[in-house]
């Protein structure tokens, strides 16, 4: 069973020569916008293996010379794949770490006794406890030191590094604000190991990624920029689309102290190692026509023309031969003969993505429509990772499908219980206890006792405590109620609302369990029961908690199993991927766009507002300060505005989709 099919989704196939040039000359040409040596790999696994190769070579070279190999190690998640690869090599007895000295790059401060937040513990759990680094060769900053001794402790750390001859390598990740180790924006290039206040962006990122509910301390003790730059070599890793924007700034923009990682441009032996997702906004990947000749696919042509329109502030049909020639797109003139021909081609392509009939228009020519006319009506399943992703991402389309008489089912894949605040449980428990008092004279002892039990638990609950199973069940029940209310508002029958409660989610923690065949079989059973003509599935694979990806993998694996079994229903089924909760589709990838009127957008907002537990007090709103309904409206309006700017019809908002073809 293939459980990771989402990782094989390639919307824009990047030619290998763009990220893996064959010669130094080719690399120099295609990377001329880049100020740091950057190695791009097709996947995280390939990139991690490359870094591990370099680390292994350094360790073995030092062993042959009878020297220590001194490493500064970060504890960020982008390094986990590298650590896993190094551990694998140790287990296969091809690599020993007996001569390695480790210095932890940063530590939280101040730490409470028995704190689960210690970054050195994370390093040990992920890497050091699984290899043969001598305990006496592992050094970390002291998160427990008294405040008046912090500076002395930091100076001592610098001295210890020097006693081993300095750092041979620094292996680090990068934060959303461009921070390396814990060096926040504003850090100077001369900064040494010191105490530093954790910035708001870094704090949000930590709170979303740390597998604990313990409060993040206000400060960090960190190696300074100068300390990191003193290393003989530096490897910075980043994976996934969520790191694409910051990596473009670090690699291609000028040095600035507002972007600490940009100081790496001054180092003679620094290597940025990223995958295609993190490289997405680099010029050679996103706008390759500016640095090299291109193989012009339809998507790349569309991307280039949209870029040109935005740069010049013109609609597509007003672009001229001069515009093409002056902006690096003369190849398109040779390919199409004139700007007019290219303009018409892309204008029509975009026009054909727009449809007010997401389920297909009956008795109509569907030659240029994104969805086929028959069968009509269609059986539809909308898979929603959490109990509100359906309305956030495609609430307008769902209402349109229902109004056009399609048989719409909604499948909520997870309970979403950990995303409900304690005050919501308290409010509902007050209600049910009051109900018991009013209508049962408090005679229902189960309700009375459970009310007291939960009230006592919340009164004594610490931030590091996890909820009991009963409380998680109640939180899941709250979200079920909200989902049913939203479906009723959208006129979806309650017997068409399915709560799958996939087991991988039920860890009670931010970190979920692995997605397994058990999850897939639950999804597959629903597919076999409904046998849909249309499936809508989350394509928001960059969500910060990873739930969307696992949910999508479960659906794609179930479809894959049905395909292997020769299921007849799948032969007449189309699968559409939506976004909206965390990002929007790039216009070159959009294959169906459903316009919304002002009234329809308001109805979509009302659907989202039915999920009251996910408003201001929701625990996991992510790094975006806007509420989910605001994000959804802004993204939908932005899509409509872009179509308008390109010279197409002007709508209030639009929901975009990309078709998935089973691999």
Regions found by a protein language model. Give the residues of each.
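ATP/nucleoside-binding phosphotransfer catalytic cores, i.e., glycine-rich phosphate-binding loops
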Residues: 2-12, 25, 30, 226, ...
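N-terminal glycine-/serine-/threonine-rich phosphate-binding loop
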Residues: 2-70, 366-367, 374
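Ligand-binding beta-strand-loop-alpha-helix segment within the catalytic cores
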Residues: 21-35, 95-169
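Glycine-rich N-terminal segment of FAD-binding domains in flavoprotein oxidoreductases
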Residues: 64-92
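Glycine-rich beta-strand-to-loop/alpha-helix junction loops that act as flexible
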Residues: 73-78, 172-176, 239
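Histidine-anchored nucleotide/phosphate-binding helix
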Residues: 82-93, 390-415, 419
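Class I SAM-dependent methyltransferase SAM-binding "motif I" and its flanking Rossmann-like core
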Residues: 181-225
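Metal-dependent de-N-acetylase/amidase catalytic core
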Residues: 205-210, 215-220, 312-381, 400-404, ...
């Amino acid at each position: 069973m293939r459980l990771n099919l989402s990782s094989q989704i390639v919307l824009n196939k990047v030619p290998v020569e763009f990220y893996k040039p064959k010669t130094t000359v080719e690399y120099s040409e295609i990377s001329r916008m880049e100020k740091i040596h950057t190695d791009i790999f097709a996947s995280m696994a390939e990139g991690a293996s490359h870094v591990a190769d370099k680390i292994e070579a350094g360790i073995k070279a030092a062993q042959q010379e009878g020297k220590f190999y001194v490493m500064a190690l970060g504890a960020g998640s982008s390094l986990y794949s590298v650590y896993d690869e190094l551990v694998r090599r140790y287990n296969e007895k091809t690599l020993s770490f007996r001569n390695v000295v480790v210095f932890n790059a940063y530590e939280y401060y101040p730490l409470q006794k028995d704190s689960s937040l210690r970054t050195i513990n994370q390093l040990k759990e992920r890497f050091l406890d699984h290899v043969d680094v001598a305990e006496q060769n592992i050094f970390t900053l002291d998160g427990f030191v008294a405040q008046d001794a912090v500076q002395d402790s930091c100076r001592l750390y610098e001295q210890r590094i020097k006693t081993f001859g300095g750092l041979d390598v620094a292996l680090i990740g990068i934060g959303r604000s461009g921070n390396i180790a814990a060096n926040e924006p504003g850090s100077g290039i001369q900064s040494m190991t010191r105490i530093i206040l954790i910035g708001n962006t870094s704090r949000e990122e930590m709170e979303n990624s740390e597998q604990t509910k313990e409060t993040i301390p206000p400060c960090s003790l960190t190696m300074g920029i100068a300390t990191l730059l003193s290393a003989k070599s530096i490897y910075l890793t980043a994976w996934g689309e969520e790191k694409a924007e910051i990596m473009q700034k670090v690699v291609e923009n000028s040095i600035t102290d507002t972007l600490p990682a940009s100081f790496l441009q001054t180092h003679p032996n620094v290597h940025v190692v990223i995958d295609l997702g993190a490289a997405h906004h680099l010029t050679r990947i996103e706008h390759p026509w500016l640095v090299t000749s291109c193989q012009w696919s339809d998507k790349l042509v569309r991307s280039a023309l949209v870029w040109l329109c935005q740069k010049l502030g013109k609609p597509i049909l007003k672009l001229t031969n001069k515009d093409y020639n002056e902006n690096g797109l003369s190849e398109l003139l040779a390919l199409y003969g004139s700007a007019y021909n290219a303009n018409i081609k892309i204008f029509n392509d975009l026009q054909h993505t727009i449809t007010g009939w997401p389920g297909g228009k009956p008795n109509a020519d569907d030659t240029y429509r994104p969805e086929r006319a028959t069968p009509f009506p269609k059986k539809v399943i909308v898979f929603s990772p959490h109990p509100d992703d359906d309305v956030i991402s495609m609430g307008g389309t769902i209402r349109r499908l229902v109004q056009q008489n399609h048989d719409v089912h909604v499948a909520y894949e997870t309970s979403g219980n950990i995303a409900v605040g304690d005050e919501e449980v308290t409010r509902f428990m007050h209600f049910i206890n009051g109900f018991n008092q009013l209508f049962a004279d408090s005679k229902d002892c189960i309700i009375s006792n459970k009310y007291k039990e939960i009230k006592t638990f919340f009164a004594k609950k610490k931030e590091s405590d996890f909820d009991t199973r009963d409380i998680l069940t109640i939180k899941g029940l709250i979200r079920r109620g909200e989902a049913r209310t939203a479906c009723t508002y959208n006129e979806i029958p309650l017997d068409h609302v399915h709560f799958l409660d996939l087991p991988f989610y039920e860890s009670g923690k931010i970190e979920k369990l692995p997605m397994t065949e058990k999850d897939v079989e639950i999804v597959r059973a629903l597919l076999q029961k409904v046998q849909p003509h249309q499936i809508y599935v989350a394509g928001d694979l960059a969500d910060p908690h990873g739930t969307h990806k696992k949910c999508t993998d479960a659906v794609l694996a179930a479809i894959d199993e049905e395909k292997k079994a020769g299921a007849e229903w799948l032969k007449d089924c189309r699968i559409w991927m939506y976004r909206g909760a965390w990002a929007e589709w790039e216009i070159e990838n959009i294959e169906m766009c459903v316009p919304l009127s002002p009234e329809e957008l308001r109805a979509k907002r009302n659907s989202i507002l039915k999920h009251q537990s996910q408003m201001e007090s929701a625990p996991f709103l992510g790094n975006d300060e806007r509420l989910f309904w605001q994000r959804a409206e802004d993204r939908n309006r932005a899509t409509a505005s872009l179509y308008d700017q390109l010279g197409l019809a002007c709508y209030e908002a639009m929901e975009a989709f990309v078709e998935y073809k089973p691999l």
